[in-house]
Amino acid sequence: MATLLRSKLSNVATSVSNKSQAKVSGMFARMGFQAATDEEAVGFAHCDDLDFEHRQGLQMDILKAEGEPCGDEGAEPPVEGDIHYQRGSGAPLPPSGSKDQVGAGGEFGGHDKPKITAWEAGWNVTNAIQGMFVLGLPYAILHGGYLGLFLIIFAAVVCCYTGKILIACLYEENEDGEVVRVRDSYVAIANACCAPRFPTLGGRVVNVAQIIELVMTCILYVVVSGNLMYNSFPGLPVSQKSWSIIATAVLLPCAFLKNLKAVSKFSLLCTLAHFVINILVIAYCLSRARDWAWEKVKFYIDVKKFPISIGIIVFSYTSQIFLPSLEGNMQQPSEFHCMMNWTHIAACVLKGLFALVAYLTWADETKEVITDNLPGSIRAVVNIFLVAKALLSYPLPFFAAVEVLEKSLFQEGSRAFFPACYGGDGRLKSWGLTLRCALVVFTLLMAIYVPHFALLMGLTGSLTGAGLCFLLPSLFHLRLLWRKLLWHQVFFDVAIFVIGGICSVSGFVHSLEGLIEAYRTNAED
């Protein structure tokens, strides 16, 4: 009897000791230190699960004691293990395999929202990376030669890879070893990387980068509109700055936008028109194939201007900022990788051919916007279509920038820096409308004082494009999935981060130097 009692006391002491060690290990793990052994990590996981179940049971007992309903009437009580709890989410998540896991618009319960196919998702990505900014790629070949062509391929490969690893950061394994979607946006990934010490720092950095990129995109649309109209009608006594003012006057109603229903109707027409314009440019270039200057395509680079070309190429591939939302709205998220592969392969081939053929046609006379090289009769028609596309494309980044600003500064309750832009009836307040108009005017002023399409595009690509497409995805991937990565994945992430950082700094510095030089000499595009 004494032996049996001693044995039970020993077992109890051992169990208490193991749980204490597991809790201590868990405390160090939460502080950022890795557990010493796998057994301790397993012990911490079991202890944490038991602690959650115990607390959940206490809460349920209290609710029942108070007479509050717990679920549907007549329903069977939940069996242990039916509740899937995800640490850090603050709420239970639906079981694995449920459509509730992959919601849209930042909600995990978005199964009632319409989903898109892989083809539709690919069309959205194609619109993002095959936009009118490809018109600046021949200018990148002018300063980069064959290395510029290689960079078009390299940027496609890297952006495709970083898009995939960014989506991988949305998922984690739950207690059952099942991979579930626990995040819904780029901002959520950034916040998870900076938690627990700075839980909102990462999201703010991403928001700032996103706002800069969106506003710079709006500025580029105004710049290219003024540039195209000025070169289409050189005989008119209207300067490029005046054309930019006229374009902005047309865009001023964007300040009154509440949604993009009206604008979205023109998106398909704009995209088709852009493809037609690209075909017309390539057809004209092919008609002059006998005069192509192959000897002008060089292997050496212009050290000062080539970094600007890197920014132009990177900016033409930016799509990472909306990929989490896009993947969350797909009917089959498992097809995301295949969709990314084909869209970036197609973009790489089309961009490479367009840039090379256009440069071979005009060689050293290649301008920042390639349509400015077309003959007068063709140029006017093509440029008018391009201006229409630019003006119809402007509301999309403008509305997105306004939404980010409103959510960051005006709609976070007690944490908001300024009062809400909307009244209780949902109407936009007068000062909120004033701020929107001020944003439109700001894009105009930037377009007037910095009317250099390629330099602005290179600056934006080097600053926010490289950050959102190269630096942050690789850094987040290493931070969130470090323990699961293979050695070659770690190598790729580190290499992309280092190369992206060098290209970003170099391109940013040289773009600024180019803008300063152009401003001093009062050069016009």
UniProtKB/Swiss-Prot annotation:
List GO BP terms, alphabetically. Answer: beta-alanine transport; gamma-aminobutyric acid import; gamma-aminobutyric acid transport; glycine transport; neurotransmitter transport
- Alphabetic keyword roster: Cell projection, Cytoplasmic vesicle, Membrane, Neurotransmitter transport, Nitration, Synapse, Transmembrane, Transmembrane helix, Transport
Q: Which residues cross the membrane?
A: 133-153, 205-225, 266-286, 306-326, 342-362, 384-404, 439-459, 462-482, 490-510
Species = Macaca fascicularis
Which segments carry the region annotation Disordered?
69-111
This protein's name = Vesicular inhibitory amino acid transporter
Q: Which gene encodes it?
A: SLC32A1
GO MF annotation, one: glycine transmembrane transporter activity
Membrane topology note: Multi-pass membrane protein
What role does this protein play? Antiporter that exchanges vesicular protons for cytosolic 4-aminobutanoate or to a lesser extend glycine, thus allowing their secretion from nerve terminals. The transport is equally dependent on the chemical and electrical components of the proton gradient. May also transport beta-alanine. Acidification of GABAergic synaptic vesicles is a prerequisite for 4-aminobutanoate uptake.
